C-alpha cells in the first residue's frame, strides 16, 4: 500500500513538472521508444587531494610567481559548472627578484582542456551536451625567442 502511494505521488510530481516547464518542439519526445524518463547524474566532486596539499592557498602562487596572473570569473548559467575562474597573465614579460620586468623572458599562459555540460537547446531545460573548453590555469616564464636577421 505504501509503495503504491509513493508511486502515485511520484507520478503526480512528474505530471506537474511537465506542465510547469514549457517544452519546445525540438525537445526529445517523452513518448518516443527508448526515451529515458528519469536520469540522475551525481555531479558531486570528490576531493582526492591530501589535506596538506589542499591547505595551500592557490592565491599565493598567482602573486609570488615570476609570471604573475589574475583570475577572472567566467559565468554561464547554461553551463555546468556555471562559474569557472580563468587565469590571465598580468604582463607580457616576467618579473625578476627586484620586481622589475625582465625583457629576456616572456610570460605565457598555461591552458588546460576541461569538460563541461552545456544546456542544449536552450528551450529544453534538462538536455545537456558534453563540451570541451580550454581554460587558462596559470602563467609561466619562458625564454624569449631571438631571431637574427640574415
From Swiss-Prot:
GO MF terms held by the record: cytokine activity; protein heterodimerization activity; protein homodimerization activity
One CC-aspect GO term: extracellular space
Polar residues bias: start-end ranges: 62-72
Superkingdom, natural source: Eukaryota
Sugar-bearing residue positions: 63
Matching Pfam families: IL17
Location within or outside the cell: Secreted
Chief location category: secreted
Signal peptide: 1-17
GO terms of biological process kind: adaptive immune response; cellular response to glucocorticoid stimulus; cellular response to interleukin-1; defense response to fungus; defense response to Gram-negative bacterium; defense response to Gram-positive bacterium; fibroblast activation; gene expression
Disulfide bond residue pairs: 89-139, 94-141
Stretch list, region Disordered: 54-75
Primary role: Effector cytokine of innate and adaptive immune system involved in antimicrobial host defense and maintenance of tissue integrity. Signals via IL17RA-IL17RC heterodimeric receptor complex, triggering homotypic interaction of IL17RA and IL17RC chains with TRAF3IP2 adapter. This leads to downstream TRAF6-mediated activation of NF-kappa-B and MAPkinase pathways ultimately resulting in transcriptional activation of cytokines, chemokines, antimicrobial peptides and matrix metalloproteinases, with potential strong immune inflammation.
Self-association state and partner proteins as the record states: Homodimer. Forms complexes with IL17RA and IL17RC receptors with 2:1 binding stoichiometry: two receptor chains for one interleukin molecule. IL17A homodimer preferentially drives the formation of IL17RA-IL17RC heterodimeric receptor complex. IL17A homodimer adopts an asymmetrical ternary structure with one IL17RA molecule, allowing for high affinity interactions of one IL17A monomer with one IL17RA molecule (via D1 and D2 domains), while disfavoring binding of a second IL17RA molecule on the other IL17A monomer. Heterodimer with IL17F.
Family stated for the protein in its record: Belongs to the IL-17 family.
Name under which the protein is recorded: Interleukin-17A
Naturally occurring in which organism (per UniProt): Rattus norvegicus (Rat)
Taxonomic path: Eukaryota, Metazoa, Chordata, Craniata, Vertebrata
Amino acid at each position: 500500500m505504501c509503495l503504491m502511494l509513493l508511486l502515485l505521488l511520484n507520478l503526480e510530481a512528474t505530471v506537474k513538472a511537465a506542465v510547469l516547464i514549457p517544452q519546445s518542439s525540438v525537445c526529445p519526445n517523452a513518448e518516443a521508444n527508448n526515451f529515458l524518463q528519469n536520469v540522475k547524474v551525481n555531479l558531486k566532486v570528490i576531493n582526492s587531494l591530501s589535506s596538506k596539499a589542499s591547505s595551500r592557498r592557490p592565491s599565493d602562487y598567482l602573486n609570488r610567481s615570476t609570471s604573475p596572473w589574475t583570475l577572472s570569473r567566467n559565468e554561464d548559467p547554461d553551463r555546468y559548472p556555471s562559474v569557472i575562474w580563468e587565469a590571465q597573465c598580468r604582463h607580457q614579460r616576467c618579473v625578476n627578484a627586484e620586481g622589475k620586468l625582465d625583457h629576456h623572458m616572456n610570460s605565457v599562459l598555461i591552458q588546460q582542456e576541461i569538460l563541461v555540460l552545456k544546456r542544449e537547446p536552450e528551450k529544453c531545460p534538462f538536455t545537456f551536451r558534453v563540451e570541451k573548453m580550454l581554460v587558462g590555469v596559470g602563467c609561466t616564464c619562458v625564454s624569449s625567442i631571438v631571431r637574427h636577421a640574415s
